[in-house]
């Protein structure tokens, strides 16, 4: 049940997992997510789907090792089974009817941006992509983005690969060059999505952001993933994960997302130390 059939290290801290989940694979669409638990005592974490194969009955996710649960996941092997793998959750990304779009991805968020970009491309849109990473060693899926985009700009914070600078700078240049986008779709760190939205707002370009705040049950019951969008309370798990970036209360969203930062750091260190002791 929920067996890991393939595990592939894309980068030192970024890993691809292909999970046996036939029912989810049959229903999944770009933009949707799953909630997984590594073991009976583990926490539930939301991860947006990277790919799905109804014929094989598998769902692929790409995960960066940044917290306690992702550390546990990184120590699992092919053949191991997850305790829970629930989905598909959330509403699929709307891609039809667009003539020209720009997809902006940041870090491991590019794993989420890619299936959306491909769907825009398959639906006939001209697709531009701007993807950003901290450095060359963290660049992922570049070849996939090239295949499904008409224009690709790769940015790194330190200039070790592609263009040096932020994705917002590259996006603004594309807009100022006369590209008239029907929509900009952004997925990545919350701060990045905030400033992508602020970049496009003066131009009046509709901007969609994919939100992955703290979630527990994924059905709207716990209220942990609530956001303020256009002055109304929304739940990312059932109303999203896609929202109008110009209407999100970003200050509140960022504040809520950092509520458990100290606790998460403690659990991360505790989990890492546990695995170190087991290895000794």
Mark where each language-model region is.
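Local cysteine-cluster metal-coordination motifs and their immediate loop/turn environment
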Residues: 112, 190-191, 212-242, 270-275
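A generic structural signal for residues embedded in beta-strands
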Residues: 36, 83-85, 227
């Amino acid at each position: 049940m929920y067996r890991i059939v393939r595990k592939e290290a894309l980068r030192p801290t970024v890993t691809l997992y292909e999970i046996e989940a036939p029912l989810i694979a049959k229903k999944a669409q770009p933009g949707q997510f799953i909630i997984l638990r590594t073991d009976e005592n583990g926490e539930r974490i939301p991860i947006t789907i990277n790919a799905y194969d109804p014929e094989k009955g598998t769902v692929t996710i790409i995960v960066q090792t940044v917290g306690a649960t992702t550390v546990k996941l990184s120590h699992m092997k092919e053949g191991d089974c997850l305790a829970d793998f629930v989905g598909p959750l959330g509403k699929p990304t709307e891609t039809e009817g667009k003539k020209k779009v720009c997809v902006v991805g940041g870090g491991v968020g590019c794993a989420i941006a890619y299936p959306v970009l491909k769907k825009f491309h398959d639906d006939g849109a001209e697709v531009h992509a701007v993807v950003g990473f901290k450095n060359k060693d963290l660049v992922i899926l570049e070849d996939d983005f090239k295949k499904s985009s008409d224009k690709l700009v790769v940015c790194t914070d330190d200039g070790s690969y592609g263009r040096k600078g932020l994705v917002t700078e590259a996006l603004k240049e594309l807009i100022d060059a006369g590209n008239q986008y029907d929509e900009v779709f952004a997925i990545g760190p919350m701060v990045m999505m905030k400033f992508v939205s602020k970049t496009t707002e003066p131009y009046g370009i509709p901007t969609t952001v994919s939100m992955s705040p703290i979630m527990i049950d994924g059905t709207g019951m716990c209220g942990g993933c609530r956001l303020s969008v256009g002055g109304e309370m929304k739940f990312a798990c059932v109303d999203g994960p896609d929202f109008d970036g110009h209407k999100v209360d970003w200050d509140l969203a960022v504040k809520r997302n950092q509520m458990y930062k100290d606790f998460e750091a403690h659990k991360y260190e505790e989990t890492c130390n546990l695995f170190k002791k087991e290895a000794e």
